[in-house]
Amino acid sequence: MLFRSHEIFDTYGAELARLIRAEMLAHFWEEASGYEVQVSRGFTALKTCNFTVAAGQPAQHHRATVTEPGRIKQMLFGGFERCLYPLQKFDSDTERRFAVLLERDALKWFKPAKGQFQIYYKLGSEQPEYIPDFVAETDAWILMVETKARADLDTQEVQAKAAAAARWCRHASDHAASVGSKPWRYLLTPHDEVVESQRLVDFLRFEVKDLPQASSPTSN
């Protein structure tokens, strides 16, 4: 059974245009000086998400306890009020539990589709696309969030993704400031910190920041 997200555009079209503004979209490319980001103006719609599930399998409520976490990738979840898509799939129960927090604390949120942000990171000779777990809007910020097993936080791939996303958020924030929009923050969140007693603001301590590179001194 194939679910599509076309129907959300009639309901949320104007809101999507507001949230998914072009300061959110950037392209990374590698130069001698490192990663550079170009952010253009304009608007873009959310990418259409297609979900495949077994015939006859209903969507589960996102707050329902998952008794078989190993099967969660095969499951479809609904019952959202603040998600920009009516249905979502999760790669882990940690993601589902984080979505519960977003439903409570965020203004709006969604799980980006491939190609939505076009963030690329360097891993050896490859430059794969990085797709973060969540993007959420709050009163003060727009948060890009990755939830990850604590044991994997310091791996080369996770750190490369975090560095690319943090730099993307810094450039997006610079552009947002020029047009009066909210700044972006990238959060790399350990899985064992995702508990319902936490508030979304509590996760700001896991922010990964990209600092502007100092200019090289010029010789006379």
Give the predicted meaning of each segment:
Residues 1-128, 137-143, 148-220:
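Intrinsically disordered, low-complexity, repeat-rich regions
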Residues 131:
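Active-site lining segments that contact anionic ligands and/or coordinate catalytic metals
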